[in-house]
Amino acid sequence: MGPLAAKAKVSSLLSETGELLTPDQLPGLLVQARLDEVELEFRAQVNAVADAGLTPTHLDWHCLADGGRDDIFDLTVALAREYGLAVRAWLEPARRKLRQRGLPAVDHDFLDSFRLDLDGKSGRYAKLLRDLPGGLSEWAVHPALGDEQSQMIDPGWRVRRTDYDFLTSPQARALLESERIVVIDYRTIQQAWSGRPGR
């Protein structure tokens, strides 16, 4: 996938073929990425979302965890403040850094549904909900119907379908109610960020 900023302006983020470096190329990216180019690409992506009529809630690095470098993390927090967004931090050092700035961050390790076994996934989700510790937790779930078209293009369709099956089940609804779990999205976190100084 290519960048949204002009390739010539973000060359330190690109492979030899002009594509954005992938998560498995993270070590090289962290060595060569120029901070000004990271900023250009982040701005281009946020602006593209806004130009599409969508309202972003947060900035994150997707598969790159918390940006991989302190300067990239700090840039991301500054951009989030400028755009009125939250920052999604996965790892404890970054979460601690946000809390030290008076900004909300999740309290527990992140759960990614792609890392759960498909066999017994519903039971695993149920146990995780029953054992959920107090505080703010983040689960990255990827629900989708897994229809014929998605099966042809998405090798992860089974993960998505099993997420959908559990999340829309009466069991999930009952567990959320009985365990008194409040489900929020990043809009709630974004609102908390905008009400705090954080600098």
What are these regions (language model features)?
Residues 1-29, 155-158:
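Active-site gating loops and adjacent loop-to-helix segments of metal-dependent hydrolytic enzymes
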Residues 52, 126-153:
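Catalytic grooves of carbohydrate-active enzymes
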Residues 87-88, 154-199:
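C-terminal domain-boundary segment and adjacent tail
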Residues 1-5, 46, 79, 125-135:
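Short amphipathic alpha-helices and their capping/turn segments at secondary-structure boundaries
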Residues 35, 43-104, 109, 115-121, ...:
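Catalytic domains of cell-wall/extracellular-matrix polysaccharide-remodeling enzymes
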Residues 99-101, 117-120, 147-158, 197:
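Histidine/acidic-residue-rich catalytic or RNA/ligand-binding cores of hydrolases
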Residues 27-39:
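Active-site mouth loops of central-metabolism enzymes
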Residues 59, 139, 176:
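Conserved, mostly hydrophobic/aromatic
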